[in-house]
Structures are given as structure tokens and as C-alpha cells.
Amino acid sequence: MAAHRAPRGTGRRRGGRPGPRHSKRDDAKKGRGADPPRRTAYDVLAAVQDRQAYANLLLPRLLAERGITGRDAALATELTYGTLRGLGTYDAVLAACSDRPLDKLDPPVLQVLRLGAHQLLSTRVAAHAAVATSVDLARAVAGPRVSGYVNAVLRRVATRDLDAWLPLVAPDPATDTDGYLAVRYSYPRWIVAAYRDALGPAADTELEAALAAGNDRPRVTMAAFPGGPLREEIMPEGAEPTRWSPYGFTLAGGDPAALVATGTAAVQDEASQQAAIALATAPIDGQDRLWLDMAAGPGGKARLLYGLAGEAGARLVAVDVHEHRAALVRDALARAPHGESGDAAVIAADGRRPAWQDGAFDRVLLDVPCSGLGALRRRPEARWRKSESDLPALAGLQRALLRSALAACRPGGVVAYVTCSPVAAETRDVVTEVVSSTPGTEILDAPAILSAVPDVRSPAPEFAQLWPHRHTTDAIFVALLRRTR
């Protein structure tokens, strides 16, 4: 696409929450090497692109290894996650400012341009500093010959704010609403369409809010251990109790590692807590002695279920197909304060080829492997890593696991089918297909069982769907199924 040479202008940048302020030390002098926060953000973006790394795992490790703390750590974090969230929008603007197609650029150059575009369009970093530090970074990672090109492209980006760029680079919302929203909120078009379908009739008024909420910076949410100290006894200063889970609280800031190390709490989104609570409180017929977490790694829900099972006098069996993830579950349960909790067994096994007899369990939690499109606030790269063509294989695995979960549950017992995706192909379509082909299975009213949480009914009203824009949680889907024979 030919370069768009607009006159230099001023104006506000993208609306919403601003990035961190920065001092004059961010105003890099020409010729200086790449500064540590920007180099670290670049290294994470490159690893996400080239090695399928996860930013939420790699960034904390690099910050610790490089001794980056305080304001510099905040800058590296903002640049990493902000660039990943806004990548689709920034690419549209960069394409209008470049005389070379973006897919013909060397990957290091493209990543530097994206970092620069994020600073120019969505943070308070001064334009001259954003351009100068990006040129320094380009020299460091791609050599001196690209510096002129990077400088020219980013100077063109800086001629307008994001609100002024959008009408130039996005489709007309009057004729292509989904295309406009895809560029405006930085999503692949197919995810915009999938969210529209998942919201059903509510999409007319809520789709834009749902997409915007997927770009929010989430606060850290934790769960106290049932049977251990009450959350009010362990909440640090500034923390707030969650609205609906009696175990959850959100941190005002800081590192949750100290609380995690004590075993009294673990990081867990409130929607994930509600999924475990839904299984534990769903009515069953007969005994209530043995619970199964069928895809338990890395252990967040298993830990909460362990405490809930202990309070009910039940035993938990936690399973994951991968031994290293089963080891994470063992570690999570071993750190929990035992208090009233019952015992637990953790095994590595494939839920599709179970190591237990049919009908062995009273309650079964199945948190299936999924696209992760309900957790984009925490893992923004998932939107660029997944494609619509991935869904049929995922749905096939999900159906197989759900059939196995129903077989593991005794008559009168309950299965919770949970995904961190709102996409119909992974949620209501999977459940309705499996239930229709599995005699002796009925669908319970999940929203009624989660009655403390408002506005969770999905377009299929017997299923519960939480949303970031409604509940400030991940977009978790919950279906509750009972075996009748």
C-alpha cells in the first residue's frame, strides 16, 4: 500500500485508560543503544511471533533476569501488552504509512514499528521520544540501514492521533460494521463475528462493549482456600472482595507471589471461581463422596474444588493428560492449607481413555481445552494465534471429553462443562450435540444455580455465560448436566 503522507497535526490519542507517564530519561538521544524496557518488550514480542511464546510467562522472567523494576518494569509491561492488544489497529495505520507491504518487512523491523505505533497512538510517551527510541531499537535489532525507514514511517504515524487515523484505515461502519470493529478494537474479523453470534440478540447493543472490554488491563484476582483463613483475614491493604464469589478478592497492585507462597490464596479469575462453585452447589441425588476434575492442569480450579470438596466431606481426583501439568496440580494442592479439606489424588491420564470405572464419580468438572478467546485481557496474543480453522478440531476434542465426563458420572450426579471461550462452536453447540446423542442426560438451569451472579443467561437460556463487559471477569461459559440413568 502506498504511503499516506498526511500533514502534521495534533489532537488527543486513543480514548480510555492512558499508559504510564515517563520522565526525561525516556527521551533517548540519537545513537544510544536500545533502552532495557523497550528491548525487553521487543524480545517478548519477537518470541511470541517466532516461538509461540506466552507473554504472561516470558515477560516476568525477563524482567527478573534483567533486574528491571519499578517504572521501567511498568513501561516494559505496558509496551508488551499494549502492542499485542492493539496490533491489528497499528498494522492498519502502519500499512497506510509505509511504502512497503508489511508482510514483506523483516520481522524485527515490523515489531519495532508496532512498538513505536503503540507509543505514538496509545500512550503518553512524547512523539519525539517514541520515534527516537524506536530508531535506536531498530539499529540494535535490525542494523543501521533500516533506521531511516523506521524514522520515516513513524513520523508519518505521528501526524495524526488514532481517532483521526481510523476513518482513513478502517472500513466504513455503515456498510461493513464487523470490518470497522475489527480494526477499531484490534481483532481478527472472524472473532468479531463469533462474539456477535455468542451474544445473540444482545449483540446489537453490547458487541462494541464486549470487544472494548477484551482490551482492558485486568486486575489480579485471587481466591482464598475454602477451609483455610477467611479472605478478610488475608486480604492485603487496598484489596477489594469480589462481588459474587465468597472466596475472591482483587489486588490494588503489587505482586501476588507472597500470598501464593503462603498457600492461603491463589490467582484465579472470579468467573473461574464461579464455575467451581456452580459444580459444588448444583443439586444431586444420593451420596456426595467423590469428585473428579478431569482436565485439571495447571490447578487453579482443582485447588478451589479441593477445598470445596473437603468442606462437603468428599474426596477429589484431579487428572491431566500431561505429566508436567499434573505435577503443577500436585504442587497447587500441596500448598493449600489443609484445615477442613479432604484428601485428593492427582494422576496423569487421558480423560478420553479413563483410568476409572464408568459411574464412579458424584460430581465431575470438565474445563476443556479451548481457544482461550474468553481470556484475551490476560493473553492478548491468543487472538492472533488462533484461527477459525482451529475450531473443528477443538470441538471434536471437547465432544469426546464431554462424553467421557458423562460416562464417569453416576446416575443422579452432575457434570460441569466449562470453557474460557464464549464461541458457540466450543460451547452451546458442543453441549447440545453431546446431550442429544447421550440418553439419560438432562441440562440443568445453570443461571438459576449461579443466581447470585446477574445477567449470565446466554442465547441458549439454560447455559451461563459471563463476560468482561458485564461482570469484569473472563468470558467463561458454564453448562451443568445431570445423569438421570
Predicted regions and their residues:
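S-adenosylmethionine
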Residues: 1-485
